[in-house]
Amino acid sequence: MFHKIKNVFPLEDYKLLVQFISGVTKIYDVKPLFEWKEVFKTLKENELFYGVYVDVGGNGIVWNDYVDLSCEELWENGKEISTPFDGLISMSDATTIWGLNESTLRKAISYGKLKNGIDVCKYGKQWVVSIESMIREYGQPSK
């Protein structure tokens, strides 16, 4: 399975908090990479390390043209942590993961398949849906 990245946040002690579109959050320790390849030692410069961002498409993270990591490296070697938002994903991420149209999910809400306030909820302009309810109604993700 391909684990696309939604957000990355640099932390102290050369660690990264990585949020995947599947709703999983992991902590990735960059320090072991300093010994693996010379190019990663440049991350010891705090300005560069703290400039990390998710590449277009969520397939990895990037610091500059020479230093990047794939989403699979972060998934395989990151340590999963729990957060208050575990099990919740945005409706747009759910449509991507399950291969559905957003209108399909909106109809599921209006027909009562997904219950507002229990399975889905709107926060500001953003709808979030529980992964559990998506699996219940649409099965395991196709991707």
Identify the residue ranges that each predicted region occupies.
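Motif-centric detector for short Cys/His coordination patterns
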Residues: 1-126, 130-143
